[in-house]
Regions:
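Catalytic domains of carbohydrate-active enzymes, especially glycoside hydrolases
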Residues: 24-46
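Active-site beta-loop-alpha junctions enriched in small/polar residues
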Residues: 10-12, 43-45, 71-76, 119-121, ...
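Conserved, mostly hydrophobic/aromatic
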Residues: 7, 32, 40, 59, ...
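Acidic (Asp/Glu)-rich catalytic clusters
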Residues: 2, 29-34, 49-68, 90-111, ...
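Short, acidic/polar
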Residues: 17-32, 84-95, 203-211, 260
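Acidic/histidine-rich catalytic cores of soluble enzymes
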Residues: 39-40, 142-252, 257, 307
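Active-site mouth loops of central-metabolism enzymes
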Residues: 10-24, 76-84, 134-142
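Active-site acidic/histidine proton-transfer and metal-coordination neighborhood
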Residues: 65, 80-193
Length: 308
């Protein structure tokens, strides 16, 4: 039994494919391999090519696999739903053709996963981390979004891919009440959860408590750490979530506010989680000069705790 460390392109500032400052995807794969990661996420739709031959060659060269694909889009708008379903087909069409990662005993679903995140709403983006002032969806809008998530999960399942819903700061699934409501409305045989320690903390929740609470839904996990000084400054300003990340709200694992020894303990001794965790550290892509240093530091720290 083991918990394997993997990475994500957001550690190189890759969150918005329209950002003109993104590093070449080949550089990201190379540095992820150099840092010691055995796998990485595809990143936002359109960042890595959807050409299986091109991607396979680069992955093999860097001795790295793919742990998950990502839907990071507006899950609410009806007119965007066909676009999202096309993304599901395109992403699953490539990740299912790549070499599979090992499956650990006790791991409920094999990798690769499809992480599903709601995004793209200014009224929530500017209120990330502020449960008291962030607007909530009407019952009708919430039901529509849940229907879209079920459709996404069912399409992914038709490819043999497990969809996992990722509550994300600045989206319409962020806070405690929304995560609980999601868990009630989406059966666990339809989709699992990908809880993110950093997003939980950012949005007012204790990661240990929530990892324990939803152990039976937890198929995949993201790890982050948060710089306390920057975090407090960012929450006092009226800025978007990723603007705060650009200021340095996220930091290497083990250097911030989160208690990773306690997180390791709850995962290994209490809920007996097995499988994969992905390290993330969102940043401005113009600050990629320190990405390799930071992701290696996170990887080394997690190794010291017992993660593999």
């Amino acid at each position: 039994m083991a918990i394997h460390i993997t990475g994500a392109p957001c550690c190189w500032g890759v969150d918005d494919v329209k950002n003109p400052y993104l590093p070449p995807w080949q550089k990201v794969l190379y540095e992820a391999g150099q840092a010691g990661y055995k796998a990485i996420e595809l990143g936002p739709y359109g960042y890595l090519p959807l050409d299986i031959d091109v991607v396979s060659k680069e992955l093999e060269k860097n001795h790295i696999g793919i742990v998950a694909g990502t839907i990071f889009d507006d899950l609410l708008a009806e007119d965007n739903y066909p676009n999202v379903l096309k993304q599901v087909d395109d992403i699953c069409g490539i990740i299912t053709k790549l070499p599979k990662l090992p499956t650990e005993p006790g791991q409920r679903y094999p990798a690769p996963y499809l992480t599903v995140m709601d995004w793209g709403h200014d009224e929530r983006d500017y209120n990330a981390g502020h449960s008291d002032r962030a607007p909530r969806l009407s019952d009708e809008d919430w039901a529509r979004m849940m229907g879209h998530i079920k459709g996404i999960a069912e399409k992914a399942a038709s490819w043999g891919v497990r969809a996992v819903v990722h509550p994300h700061a600045g989206g319409y699934i962020e806070f405690a009440d929304e995560i609980d409501k999601l868990a009630r409305d989406i059966p666990k045989d339809v989709a699992g959860l990908c809880l993110d320690t950093g997003h939980l903390w950012y949005s007012g929740m204790d990661p240990v408590t929530w990892l324990r609470k939803y152990a039976d839904r937890l198929d995949y996990i993201h790890f982050k750490d948060i710089n306390e000084k920057v975090y407090k400054e960012v929450l006092s300003e009226h800025i978007r979530f990723f603007e705060g990340c650009g200021k340095g709200s996220m930091c290497p694992i083990g250097t911030g506010m989160l208690d990773y020894p306690a997180i390791y303990k709850v995962l290994t001794e209490e809920i007996h989680y097995n499988g994969y965790i992905t390290v993330e550290q969102e940043r401005d892509p113009r600050n990629v000069a320190t990405s390799l240093r930071d992701v290696k530091a996170s990887c080394d720290y997690l190794h010291s705790l017992g993660f593999e």
